[in-house]
């Protein structure tokens, strides 16, 4: 898609904000979150994603930081939910796929992978994907058993727009 065509829609003051929000949900956010289900996300990553999202939404609405509009009001005006919630949804959706696979599937073997003789360097331990998933599941009060029923799992992890 050509960016010039897209920016014409996003910058046009005649285009309603809800339509701009739909364009954001369909085109911009998927590009922003590509592969996010596999990232062991740190708080700094999440913060950067939120900042990038809000800059785009403010720009679409014709606002600047000087206008001092609250993030919630901008999101409500455009009709989108936080990128943080969508990242969590993507991670948990992938986790559900992984858990429903057979134990002999390659993705399950990688999940159980243990490296013998591997030493970590000094400093704070790296954050693992599994730790991020556990934190997400605690926040939404989910258990691993829930992944087996796909329909229930999808409704529980869904972040509404």
Q: What are the language-model segments listed below?
A:
Residues 1-161:
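Short linear motifs embedded in intrinsically disordered, charge-biased segments
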